[in-house]
Amino acid sequence: MISISNISYYIGGRALYENASMFIKPDDKIGLIGLNGRGKSTLLKLIYGEMKVNEGSISKSRDCTIGFLNQDLLSFQSDDAILTVAMGAFKDAVDTQREIEKILHKLETEYSEDLVDKLTRLQEKFEHLDGYTMQAKAEEVLEGIGFTTKDLHRPLREFSGGWRMRVMLAKLLLEKPSLLMLDEPTNHLDLPSIEWVENYLRTYEGAVVIVSHDREFLNNVITKTVEVTQSQLISYEGNYSFYLEEKEMRENIQQNAFENQQAKIRQAERFIERFKAKATKARQVQSRIKAINRMELVEEVIDDTAAVNFKFKFNQPSGRHVVTLKDLSKAYGDLQILRHTNATIERGDKIALIGANGKGKSTLLRILSGTEPVEGDRTIGYNVIQGFYAQHQLEALHVDNEILEELKQAGSGKTEQELRGILGCFLFSDDDQYKKIKVLSGGEKSRVALAKTLISEANFLLLDEPTNHLDFISENILIQALQQYAGSFVVVSHNRFFISQIANKIWYIENHQIKEYPGTYDEFEYWKSKQRESEAETPPPAPKKVEAPAPQPVKASNPSTRKLEKELAQLEEKIEDSQKRQTALLETMARPEVYSKFDVLSAHQQDLDKLMGALNELNKRWEEIVIELDALKAKTE
């Protein structure tokens, strides 16, 4: 469908791409990944035709249509209702509907057979264009990504940039282009809408290319990963988790081959140096020189993801009770957020505050920080030192400061070397650290504000969407730091992987009350799934930490269960056989006579890629059957 062939693209002499190639098939679901600044968004613009390659070509099939969601759409404005904007996806049907309305209006005053014939043709065309269902489809998508029925008739201009992006996403999904390109689509979505979009994209009848730093989203949608690295496009036939495993294996094989080849070269060079002056050894010396020259050199693996870790430091631990909220109420006019609710944060609590947008998560964070007026009592504990990161913190940056200078003035007591290392963690290179705050993009300013918060000596952190402008490497650094953090924190985030790694408690707002689940996000999700499965009419008791139930003997078997159990057994045999073949293939590839010959190694690597792809599909089906069996067994208990 789209062929990207040997493209090169340069910015000021720096090669973003150099002889890079990839192919997009009609049903591909591709995750485009790589460090920030490597050219992921640029590639989407090149494919879209918004930018031109310096060398090479990007060719598209004649009937290929492209829809592109990028951050530039944040500025799109319209006085039309959001339902009207979304229905712009059905342009032909909308235009036909207007023509029908004009003819119906004419027929009220002047009847003619020609008008009736034209009306009939237009109505047939309208039906062919699914015109009678277009409004229902638009409503379904808009409500799926978080809009209420009342919202649908409000003008687009009344919504914030993030909500406008949702409308543009809905319009693109409804247009159903051959290729859907989405640049950071989850940045403006909440958890329920992210899950809805995942389900939609999984069954999308077309190709999808996604740039995202949400690994759960990628794992749940994509079937192919393309990494932008060292000016190249490297493909992996699986989702993000598959990519991580496969890349590590490829790099281990390549590094072993490199080291073995270098050892052979050094041995040959020593022989040449030792015997080059001896006439009796001239033939052997020349033979070794030719052998070195004929070698197709294996490149050393370059770890371009290496990063500095950092740890939080504070001198004074807080008291046992960090913040206590009693009989708290908060409303904006008629919009009630909280009503007579209570909550306590204790030392060591690592809380993820989750839920749909508009429920009051950011409001609650400001209440906890003391920056939002509220009815009721907020009591801060003994010796609590607070650090607060949110979007409004960007306004507190000194725009004439350089980035490094801004951190120095934060008074953390850290050395310049430590500060430079921390800035490196948050994607600022040595040269970038001397840029003025006023020339930075919104995302860069967010990272500076986050770094300032994290270098403080706070023993209580409040973080509002801290991963929004981070890549995978920086996110991992932040995860490790928060895991080791000895203080307490509350984090608002829609990044499921992030919160699954850092939180020991989950907060959510329901019926204007702060609800607490005393466990990890994965345990919370398990509890929620059990609640959904329950057919009990009475409301569930207050959530408690639950452990996965011990397996129970099945009381009775039925044909469906027996069929699934048989398929499961067959799958397990296939998985075991594939794993044995994988092990044997890896052992073959590790032999010197194989990895020293790059063409042979490459052929084995292709076999391994196919095997890993098949194994991935077997494992996915195995998981599906296990879930089906669990559901069937639950019904018989």
Please place each PLM-identified region on the residue numbering.
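ABC ATP-binding cassette signature C-motif
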Residues: 1-258, 307, 311-637
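Active-site phosphate-binding and catalytic loops of NTP-dependent enzymes
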Residues: 152, 280, 299-304, 376
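Intracellular alpha-helical coupling/juxtamembrane segments of multi-pass membrane proteins
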Residues: 246-301
